[in-house]
A protein has these predicted regions:
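Hydrophobic ligand-binding cavity/cleft-lining segments
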Residues: 1-39
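Generic structural detector for well-ordered beta-strands
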Residues: 8-12, 58, 85
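Hydrophobic pocket/interface hotspot
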Residues: 17-22, 28, 59, 70, ...
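Glycine-rich portal/gate segments that line the openings of hydrophobic small-molecule binding cavities
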Residues: 27-81, 89-90, 130
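Beta-strand/loop substructures that line and gate deep hydrophobic ligand-binding cavities in soluble
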Residues: 72-130
Length: 130
């Protein structure tokens, strides 16, 4: 089993509004810095990573449960599953992103990835509460 870390942020906005903002690739691109340069091509979506590599990205279909799971397909590597949820929390919501430590990932890289996700979720909070 892979090690996991779930990073959360509480947002003072109705969960449905946050979900609607995040559920499209265009919405993701506004706050998720790791998915910069999202483009729709003939075979689906792709993103340019911070390292400059273009990788295919799949997004879960729209749903009524606040599930925002997505998958990255780096060249020459196994597909990476990125589970994400938006849940109601009284008048606001909590966004949860579960980071799965990939095989061979160092402690330092796992910690850096978790910090990156936390920064992106803080950016999402800022945008949604503005």
């Amino acid at each position: 089993m892979l090690d996991v870390q779930t990073i959360t942020v509480s947002i003072d906005r109705d969960w449905r509004a946050v979900y609607e903002f995040c559920r499209t690739p265009e919405g993701f691109a506004k706050w998720a810095s790791g998915l910069g340069g999202l483009e729709r091509g003939a075979t689906g979506w792709s993103a340019r990573t911070p390292e400059g590599v273009t990788i295919p990205v799949r997004f879960l279909e729209a749903n009524a449960q606040g599930v925002l799971d997505h998958w990255l397909s780096p060249p020459g590597a196994a597909e990476i599953y990125l589970p994400m949820r938006v849940i109601a929390n009284q008048a606001g919501c909590t966004v949860m992103f579960t980071l799965l430590r990939q095989p061979g990932m160092t402690d330092e890289r796992f910690a850096a990835d978790a910090a990156w996700v936390a920064r992106d979720l803080a950016r999402l909070k800022e945008m949604m509460e503005a």
